[in-house]
């Protein structure tokens, strides 16, 4: 009997292990298929972009030919002799082309006309590496000559040493040497080839530098915002460097993350970045931020680089790169007739911050000659005390007394946790959407690892449908209706409130958390996730 029971237990254990392995394999395969589909879709978008670019080029070339024909026609009007050199058909085509005045679409050459003087202006002068493509993440590192100390070798070691073997196959690190001094560039290349020969030969690391003809004349720039002439030149060239690097990197992967040559990284940074991006794959984000400093750790979807590069080229002489990025977001989503808070809420859906920071700035001596910069990311060493989600744009308010600047607005935007002094009956937390939203589910998590006892107690979750009458709802849902039109759909239990929203209540205008009894403790809200219905 014991043997039989042991046999049964062994069989059950085998079946359980087999089912678990099968489930994991199916889940992993599904995840890989999603990534593959995303890459195919992005590749298709990129091919369309290239086709449009080539059409634009052909249009410009045709326009140039038309201008040549016009000059020929002008000459024939002054002298009848050249006319005899052309056939009747050629003369007919000349007249048709010169009689049409097509509008010309502005291009990169409108903002950088000097590029037309040399056909190799947009081709790297130096290009070292295997030309790897099809990766998940491309990391761009611009580097220039520093008077005191270079941090490039240490930065690359930090990035590479914190990658697992399989991750080294799914990314490429592009080092952009933003100098035209051939001796200096060759010296940097030689050092990198000596230090990272294995990584270069495998395709993990690539090195490029621009041709001298890429840069316009930077000697007569207008001084703005109180910056010195040297600083204006430095930031202007920096904008051009970023653009060249982005244009080169765009076709290599799904995402592009901007780094600097004087940083260190956290362990498991690559997997964290990739998973965070996949988690937000259904959201219309434009920038994911993995550091709060300047342009460090800013990640973009590869197709968006076209818009970003074009925008920077339009204003590369006017402002620094981080200001220009903010202007792009403003142009895309901000309403001039609304206030600054509304604009910030809209931009927060395109610019999503991950905490804690994954990159830390370590360079003391700036690439701007004579500048000392003691910049460090204060979020780099912090533990994660809140969970970040992308929520629908909303105006938030509360009757609770906020403690030490831990506001509800920051929590809703994923910047901080909300901390309030002892709630009493009648207190509320309100999320009023900018426009009604079809909501699938909700999750509110109170307390955190530092203060696990500061949770919401005796608090209910309520929603306000857009329609106050004529709802096709069940008797059970109808009984949850309150006098002010809200419906009570859940409550906090052990500091957590989560559940599904009855589809018949959609679209929803607002969510409200209502305190129904006095609390004996303070309250922290560290996770808010109002999940929209996916199409």
UniProtKB/Swiss-Prot annotation:
Lineage of producing organism: Eukaryota, Metazoa, Chordata, Craniata, Vertebrata
Gene that encodes the chain: MGAT4A
Cytoplasmic compartment spans: 1-6
Species of origin: Bos taurus (Bovine)
Reactions accelerated catalytically: N(4)-{beta-D-GlcNAc-(1->2)-alpha-D-Man-(1->3)-[beta-D-GlcNAc-(1->2)-alpha-D-Man-(1->6)]-beta-D-Man-(1->4)-beta-D-GlcNAc-(1->4)-beta-D-GlcNAc}-L-asparaginyl-[protein] + UDP-N-acetyl-alpha-D-glucosamine = N(4)-{beta-D-GlcNAc-(1->2)-[beta-D-GlcNAc-(1->4)]-alpha-D-Man-(1->3)-[beta-D-GlcNAc-(1->2)-alpha-D-Man-(1->6)]-beta-D-Man-(1->4)-beta-D-GlcNAc-(1->4)-beta-D-GlcNAc}-L-asparaginyl-[protein] + UDP + H(+); an N(4)-{beta-D-GlcNAc-(1->2)-alpha-D-Man-(1->3)-[alpha-D-Man-(1->6)]-beta-D-Man-(1->4)-beta-D-GlcNAc-(1->4)-beta-D-GlcNAc}-L-asparaginyl-[protein] + UDP-N-acetyl-alpha-D-glucosamine = an N(4)-{beta-D-GlcNAc-(1->2)-[beta-D-GlcNAc-(1->4)]-alpha-D-Man-(1->3)-[alpha-D-Man-(1->6)]-beta-D-Man-(1->4)-beta-D-GlcNAc-(1->4)-beta-D-GlcNAc}-L-asparaginyl-[protein] + UDP + H(+); an N(4)-{beta-D-GlcNAc-(1->2)-alpha-D-Man-(1->3)-[beta-D-GlcNAc-(1->2)-[beta-D-GlcNAc-(1->6)]-alpha-D-Man-(1->6)]-beta-D-Man-(1->4)-beta-D-GlcNAc-(1->4)-beta-D-GlcNAc}-L-asparaginyl-[protein] + UDP-N-acetyl-alpha-D-glucosamine = an N(4)-{beta-D-GlcNAc-(1->2)-[beta-D-GlcNAc-(1->4)]-alpha-D-Man-(1->3)-[beta-D-GlcNAc-(1->2)-[beta-D-GlcNAc-(1->6)]-alpha-D-Man-(1->6)]-beta-D-Man-(1->4)-beta-D-GlcNAc-(1->4)-beta-D-GlcNAc}-L-asparaginyl-[protein] + UDP + H(+); an N(4)-{beta-D-GlcNAc-(1->2)-alpha-D-Man-(1->3)-[beta-D-GlcNAc-(1->2)-alpha-D-Man-(1->6)]-beta-D-Man-(1->4)-beta-D-GlcNAc-(1->4)-[alpha-L-Fuc-(1->6)]-beta-D-GlcNAc}-L-asparaginyl-[protein] + UDP-N-acetyl-alpha-D-glucosamine = N(4)-{beta-D-GlcNAc-(1->2)-[beta-D-GlcNAc-(1->4)]-alpha-D-Man-(1->3)-[beta-D-GlcNAc-(1->2)-alpha-D-Man-(1->6)]-beta-D-Man-(1->4)-beta-D-GlcNAc-(1->4)-[alpha-L-Fuc-(1->6)]-beta-D-GlcNAc}-asparaginyl-[protein] + UDP + H(+)
Job description of the protein: Glycosyltransferase that catalyze the transfer of GlcNAc from UDP-GlcNAc to the GlcNAcbeta1-2Manalpha1-3 arm of the core structure of N-linked glycans through a beta1-4 linkage and participates in the production of tri- and tetra-antennary N-linked sugar chains. Involved in glucose transport by mediating SLC2A2/GLUT2 glycosylation, thereby controlling cell-surface expression of SLC2A2 in pancreatic beta cells.
Sorted UniProt keywords: Coiled coil, Glycoprotein, Glycosyltransferase, Golgi apparatus, Membrane, Metal-binding, Phosphoprotein, Secreted, Signal-anchor, Transferase, Transmembrane, Transmembrane helix
Keyword Coiled coil tagged: yes
Taxonomic superkingdom: Eukaryota
Glycosylation sites: 77, 458
Protein name in UniProt: Alpha-1,3-mannosyl-glycoprotein 4-beta-N-acetylglucosaminyltransferase A
A single BP term in Gene Ontology: protein N-linked glycosylation
Post-translational modification summary for this protein: N-glycosylated.
Distribution of this protein across tissues and organs: Highly expressed in small intestine, kidney, lung and spleen. Weakly expressed in brain, heart and liver.
Biophysicochemical property: pH dependence: Optimum pH is 7.3.
EC primary class: transferase
Membrane topology term: Single-pass type II membrane protein
Record has Glycosyltransferase as a keyword: yes
InterPro entries with a match to the protein in the record: Glyco_transf_54, MGAT4_A/B/C_C
Cofactor annotation: a divalent metal cation
Molecular function, one GO term: metal ion binding
EC number of the protein: 2.4.1.145
Outcome, altering residue 79 to A: Does not abolish enzyme activity
Pathway assigned in UniProt: Protein modification; protein glycosylation
Family membership: Belongs to the glycosyltransferase 54 family.
Documented activity regulation: Inhibited by UDP.
Subcellular location field: Golgi apparatus membrane
GO terms for cellular component: endoplasmic reticulum; endoplasmic reticulum-Golgi intermediate compartment; extracellular region; Golgi membrane; Golgi stack; peroxisome
């Amino acid at each position: 009997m014991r043997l039989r029971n042991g046999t049964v237990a062994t069989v059950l254990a085998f079946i359980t292990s087999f089912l678990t392995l099968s489930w994991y394999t199916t889940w992993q395969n599904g995840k890989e298929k999603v990534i593959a589909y995303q890459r195919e879709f992005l590749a298709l978008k990129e091919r369309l972009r290239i086709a449009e670019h080539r059409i634009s080029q052909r249009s410009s070339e045709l326009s140039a030919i038309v201008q040549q024909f016009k000059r020929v026609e002008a000459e024939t009007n002054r002298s009848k002799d050249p006319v005899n050199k052309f056939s009747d058909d050629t003369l007919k085509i000349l007249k048709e082309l010169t009689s049409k005045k097509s509008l010309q679409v502005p291009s990169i050459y409108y903002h950088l006309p000097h590029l037309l003087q040399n056909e190799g202006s947009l081709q790297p002068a130096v290009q070292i590496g295997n030309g790897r493509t099809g990766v998940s993440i491309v990391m761009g590192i611009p580097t220039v000559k520093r008077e005191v100390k270079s941090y490039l070798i240490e930065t690359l070691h930090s990035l590479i040493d914190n990658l697992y073997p399989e991750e080294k196959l799914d990314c490429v690190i592009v080092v952009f040497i933003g100098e035209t001094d051939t001796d200096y560039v060759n010296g940097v290349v030689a050092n990198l080839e000596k230090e990272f020969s294995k990584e270069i030969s495998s395709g993990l690391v690539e090195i490029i530098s621009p041709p001298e003809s890429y840069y316009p004349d930077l000697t007569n720039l207008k001084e703005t915002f109180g910056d010195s002439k040297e600083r204006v030149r430095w930031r202007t060239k920096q904008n051009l460097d970023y653009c060249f690097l982005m244009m080169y990197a765009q076709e290599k992967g799904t995402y592009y993350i901007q780094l600097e040559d004087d940083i260190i990284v956290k362990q498991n940074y690559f997997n964290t970045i990739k998973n965070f991006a996949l988690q937000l794959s259904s959201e219309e984000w434009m920038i994911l931020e993995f550091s709060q400093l300047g342009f460090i750790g800013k990640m973009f979807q590869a197709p968006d680089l076209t818009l970003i590069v074009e925008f920077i080229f339009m204003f590369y002489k006017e402002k620094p790169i981080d200001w220009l990025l903010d202007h792009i977001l403003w142009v895309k989503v901000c309403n001039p007739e609304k206030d600054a808070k509304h604009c910030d809420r809209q931009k927060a859906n395109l610019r999503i911050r991950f905490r804690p920071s994954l990159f830390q700035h370590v360079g003391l001596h700036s690439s701007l000659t004579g500048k000392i910069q003691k910049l460090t990311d204060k979020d780099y060493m912090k533990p994660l005390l809140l969970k970040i989600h992308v929520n629908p744009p909303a105006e938030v308010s509360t009757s609770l007394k906020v403690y030490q600047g831990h506001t509800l607005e920051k929590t809703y935007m994923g910047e901080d946790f909300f901390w309030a002094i002892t709630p009493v009956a009648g207190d509320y937390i309100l999320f009023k959407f900018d426009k009604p939203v079809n909501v699938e589910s909700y999750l509110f998590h109170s307390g955190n690892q530092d203060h696990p006892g500061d949770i919401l107690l005796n608090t209910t979750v309520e929603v306000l449908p857009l329609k106050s009458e004529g709802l096709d709802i069940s008797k059970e849902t109808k009984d949850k209706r309150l006098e002010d039109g809200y419906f009570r759909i859940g409550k906090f239990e052990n500091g957590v409130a989560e559940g599904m929203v009855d589809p018949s209540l959609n679209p929803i205008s607002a969510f409200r958390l209502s305190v129904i009894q006095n609390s004996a403790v303070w309250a922290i809200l560290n996770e808010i996730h109002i999940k929209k219905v996916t199409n």
